[in-house]
Amino acid sequence: MTLLPNERIDDLQFRGLKIIQNPQYFCFGMDAVLLSHFARLKKADRAADLGTGTGILPLLLWGRYEFRHMTGIEIQSNIADMASRSVSLNNLDEKITIINEDLRNFGFGSQAGTMDAVISNPP
């Protein structure tokens, strides 16, 4: 796994999951961990994380529920790239997709109306 300058791999201490973070941008906090305990997903669920950031919610929720698929949408290209690499680091490319897009321009296309859950951790 290639790390960019100032990036690190943090062990989530949960089901062997790891995340790539860069303290010069943003590192997840307790709010993401707490939110992951409030969201309820089923194994067959398809979900979206709006403003996924580093991808912490999809990773934590995968660890809890092993959902069918989650799409994380992030506007910042460097953060979306970091989230995508975290997904790959955990071998979850078939379960979590990170899309670098502005939510105002994003259309779910053929996925429209097919999400079982939508989550977001507002700033």
Which residue ranges define each predicted feature?
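Accessory (non-catalytic) regions of SAM-dependent nucleic-acid methyltransferases
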Residues: 1-4, 54-56
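Class I SAM-dependent transferase core
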Residues: 2-43
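Conserved SAM/SAH cofactor-binding pocket of Class I
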Residues: 38-123
